[in-house]
Regions:
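Small/aliphatic-rich secondary-structure junction motif
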Residues: 1-61, 76, 83, 157, ...
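Conserved phosphate-coordination/catalytic loops
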Residues: 11, 62, 119-123
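Structural beta-alpha unit
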Residues: 73-140
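Gly/Ser-rich helix-loop-strand patches that form or flank binding pockets
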Residues: 17, 117-174
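Short, surface-exposed alpha-helical segments at coil->helix boundaries
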Residues: 57, 61-72, 100
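A structural micro-motif
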Residues: 29, 113, 160-161
Length: 177
């Protein structure tokens, strides 16, 4: 089973990540955590590429890497990744670019073999739909956004089972989890 956990920020995605990890552990599922950043204009793609190269030489992180680093720390605190990787720290230097819109970090999991952190850029719905279609996820776990329209659009346009985490209280016991 393959699970995609969509996070958007450190401030609001904690419950989504917590539930996603619990579900992944329960099913021993291959897990991917994705953050979709703002869309980069076609006119500025080359400039953004040059800027990212320059940022690397200056030791700046590209937008969204902080969210992936936060997810990595959460995975480490919950022993979801191998101890050797935890000791080495977040591997931002091994962020693999797959096209102009997708970068990925591969991790070795303790509960399952594959744990990936993905950073995509573009329209949230289109990028998540593309990720689900190309990687064949069985379940996508998303947070209950304050924007009802966005959750509705995801459910309508993404061809995957969708688990919506809304009003999750980590101190409460849930029968399903």
């Amino acid at each position: 089973m393959k699970i995609l956990i969509a996070v958007g920020s450190k401030e609001y995605s904690g419950p989504t990540l917590q539930v996603g990890i619990k579900v992944a552990k329960a099913f021993n599922a291959s897990t991917t955590i994705v953050d979709v950043g703002e869309k980069v204009s076609e006119f500025s793609t080359k400039v953004v590429g040059l800027t990212q190269e320059r940022m690397e030489s200056w030791d700046f992180d590209r937008p969204g890497v902080d969210v992936l680093e936060w997810a990595f720390k959460y995975l480490a605190e919950n022993n979801f990744i191998e101890p050797q990787q935890i000791e080495a720290g977040f591997p931002k230097t091994t962020l693999v670019e797959k096209d102009g819109r997708r970068a990925e970090v591969y991790l070795k999991g303790t509960v399952c073999d594959d744990v990936n952190l993905i950073l995509r850029n573009g329209d949230i719905i289109a990028e998540l739909r593309d990720e689900v279609q190309t990687e064949f996820y069985d379940v996508m776990i998303i947070g209950g956004s304050g924007k009802r329209r966005m959750v509705h659009d995801m459910i309508q346009y993404i061809d995957s089972s969708i688990f919506v985490v809304k009003n999750y209280d980590p101190s409460q016991e849930y029968q399903i989890l």
